[in-house]
């Protein structure tokens, strides 16, 4: 969820997403996206000429109820629900369906997880509740940091974070998470950096610096 971080006024932002999604679908790759709080609030998203998946399904999952997408050739079931409104206070995951038998079950959810006071109380739930669903992997969105909330013996519960740090407070590598699944539905995942700009902290000794211009000179020499 949250394809865009807030509202966007340049139509090229949305068209860029449409173009890249079309490339995936054109290559036979299924795309499943849930609307997060920013997507739900952004009226422009619903007006985009979005491509359909190879099987004819929409790339956005339903806002009305939890939806399951079955990728039969891959043995994968994807469960998720989009935000209907920006401020979603209900525990959406509580109504997600039981895992599909004999398939690798992925839950996708836009949430801050219960108890998170920094990123907003969106679709609150706990890692224990997600674990009890019996899915094989949880892909979470909303928080811009990569985090793993896996409980011992349970499935990975992973925030991939955002693809690109937006400012100095979002430091370190940013990217996506690639999940590999074997024939027994055991999975392993790794972080794949995709950012093009990083914001490293920089310490400058200003004791002998007399003006702002000198700060810039010292910074550029580092």
Where would I find each of the regions flagged by the language model?
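His/Asp/Glu-rich metal-coordinating catalytic cores
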Residues: 7-188
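Short, conserved active-site loops that position catalytic residues or coordinate cofactors/metal ions
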Residues: 1-2
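C-terminal functional module detector
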Residues: 168-222
């Amino acid at each position: 969820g949250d394809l865009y971080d807030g509202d966007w006024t340049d139509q090229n932002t949305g068209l860029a997403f449409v173009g890249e999604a079309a490339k995936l679908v054109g290559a036979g790759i299924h795309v499943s996206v849930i609307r997060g709080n920013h997507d739900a609030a952004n009226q422009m998203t619903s007006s985009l000429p979005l491509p359909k998946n190879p099987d004819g399904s929409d790339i956005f999952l339903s806002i009305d109820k939890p939806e399951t997408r079955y990728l039969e050739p891959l043995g994968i079931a994807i469960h998720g629900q989009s935000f209907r409104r920006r401020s979603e206070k209900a525990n959406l995951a509580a109504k997600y369906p039981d895992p599909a038998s004999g398939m690798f079950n992925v839950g996708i959810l836009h949430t801050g997880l219960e108890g998170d006071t920094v990123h907003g109380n969106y679709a609150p739930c706990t890692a224990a509740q997600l674990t009890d669903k019996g899915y094989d992997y949880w892909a979470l969105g909303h928080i811009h940091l990569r985090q793993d909330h896996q409980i011992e013996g349970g499935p990975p519960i992973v925030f991939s974070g955002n693809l690109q740090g937006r400012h100095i407070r979002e430091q370190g590598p940013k990217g996506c998470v690639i999940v590999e699944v074997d024939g027994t539905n055991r999975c392993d995942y790794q972080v794949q950096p995709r950012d093009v700009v990083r914001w490293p902290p920089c310490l400058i000794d200003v004791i002998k610096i007399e003006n702002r211009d000198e700060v810039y000179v010292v910074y550029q020499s580092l």
